[in-house]
């Protein structure tokens, strides 16, 4: 089939959660279909585009910039139009013009919108069956985020937008021929937005073990590690909660333990905290994360808001890392407490779980082995993505 894959970010290199998911779907689709990728790009990504052209039938891109001053204009437009801010912000005339040109040249069988932001573009592809690939139930993610915020302008904005997102997401899920959800929990949330039940294809986010070799951790590995894009509000909330509520308990027993916070664009407040306390190592983006994995006695995902599946958990398990997360953090992932990971939801319990991994090397190694085996048997992309073909055939009759 002729597939048009629409992405909000270029899915290569797979250096963030959404890009990992899309990258593995793209690889799978390119093996079986004539795949055209259309994506927004930021800055000079010519090397990444060249690599993607070796995999896809064609790659087309549209530049996009994000500026705080522009966001104020999009917020005003969102208020006036009563449409979700995220959708208004990514509605660009240049993308619509490119798609009009491509659709005049090619009759696509499938318009595959990767994430809700790109659904508005799939809608304009004539004659194609529309698929929404939902990385999460976006309305629920923003509702959970709003629930964690104190009173203030940010809470008002998120509280307004999750309600608009719920209405918008529900409409898309009713109108598109096919929906891909990453978990049963997300399927339920999407159906709530629709106001009705519907058939959806539930496919977990998948990874490629060939790209995720087992990490040989240092014998004296004793750092705590968090990896994630640090401009993403759920990650900011998670790291701040860990620093404020959990780390002081850990430091009572191990006062010199270092917390490595690795990820793109950390907020200035977090950078300043790292400058004031040498035990907080705020790195920003790093090309090679392996040295941080090697030093880590515990990998943490202390998330309290968000939705979908946490790719960082899949990556860490695939590389044999001992891991502590919250119940919400491992939502949608078939892990078992004390077998594959440690799960804790209160500061005291989370601190105790981290301390167990830092002090019990045998337990840490055991969890790492079992976690990697879980990924091998359940979350490898070659098997996990196969139902996409079934969905394509179904929607094309």
Q: What residue ranges belong to the model's regions?
A:
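N-terminal subdomain of nucleotide-sugar transferases
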Residues: 1-62, 105
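Acceptor-binding helix/loop patch of EC 2.4 sugar-transfer enzymes
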Residues: 70-89, 130-170, 229
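Donor nucleotide-sugar binding/catalytic pocket of nucleotide-sugar-dependent glycosyltransferases
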Residues: 139, 158-214
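Acidic donor-binding loop of glycosyltransferase active sites
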Residues: 177, 279, 291-308, 319-322
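Conserved catalytic-core segment of nucleotide-activated headgroup transferases in glycan assembly
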Residues: 192, 202-295
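Short hydrophobic beta-strand element within catalytic cores of glycosyltransferases
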Residues: 312-318, 322-326
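Conserved acidic donor-binding segment of nucleotide-sugar-dependent glycosyltransferases
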Residues: 341-348, 356-362
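A short, well-ordered alpha-helix in the C-terminal region of glycosyltransferases
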Residues: 363-378, 384-389
């Amino acid at each position: 089939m002729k597939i048009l894959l629409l992405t909000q970010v270029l899915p290569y290199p797979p250096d963030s959660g959404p890009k990992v998911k899309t990258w593995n779907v793209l690889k799978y689709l390119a093996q079986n279909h004539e795949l055209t990728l259309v994506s927004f790009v930021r800055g000079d990504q010519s090397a990444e585009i060249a690599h993607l052209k070796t995999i896809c039938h064609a790659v087309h891109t549209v530049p996009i910039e994000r500026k705080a001053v522009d966001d104020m204009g999009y917020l005003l437009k969102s208020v006036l139009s009563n449409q979700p801010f995220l959708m208004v912000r990514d509605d660009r005339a240049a993308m619509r013009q490119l798609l009009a040109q491509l659709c005049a040249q090619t009759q696509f069988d499938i318009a595959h919108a990767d994430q809700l932001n790109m659904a508005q573009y799939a809608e304009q592809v004539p004659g194609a069956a529309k698929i929404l690939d939902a990385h999460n139930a976006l309305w629920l993610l923003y509702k959970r985020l709003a629930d964690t915020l104190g009173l203030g302008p940010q809470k008002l904005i998120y509280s307004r937008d999750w309600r608009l997102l719920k209405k918008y997401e529900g409409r898309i899920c009713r109108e598109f021929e096919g929906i891909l959800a990453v978990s049963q929990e997300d399927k339920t949330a999407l159906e709530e937005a629709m106001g009705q039940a519907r058939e959806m294809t539930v496919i977990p986010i998948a990874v490629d073990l060939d790209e995720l070799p087992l990490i040989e951790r240092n014998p004296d590995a004793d750092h705590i590690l968090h990896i994630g894009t640090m401009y993403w509000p759920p990650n900011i909330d998670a790291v701040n909660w860990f620093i404020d509520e959990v780390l002081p308990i850990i430091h009572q027993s191990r006062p010199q333990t270092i917390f490595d916070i690795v990820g793109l664009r950390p907020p200035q407040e977090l950078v300043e905290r790292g400058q004031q306390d040498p035990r907080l190592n705020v790195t920003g983006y790093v090309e090679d994360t392996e040295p941080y994995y090697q030093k880590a006695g515990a990998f943490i995902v202390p998330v309290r808001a968000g939705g979908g599946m946490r790719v960082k958990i899949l990556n860490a398990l695939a590389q044999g890392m001992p891991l502590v997360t919250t119940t919400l953090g491992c939502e949608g992932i078939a892990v078992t407490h004390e077998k594959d990971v440690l799960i804790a939801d209160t500061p005291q319990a989370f601190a105790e779980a981290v301390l167990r991994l830092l002090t019990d090397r045998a337990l840490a190694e055991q969890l790492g082995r079992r976690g990697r085996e879980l990924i091998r048997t359940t979350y490898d992309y070659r098997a996990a993505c196969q139902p996409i073909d079934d969905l394509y055939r179904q929607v094309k009759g």
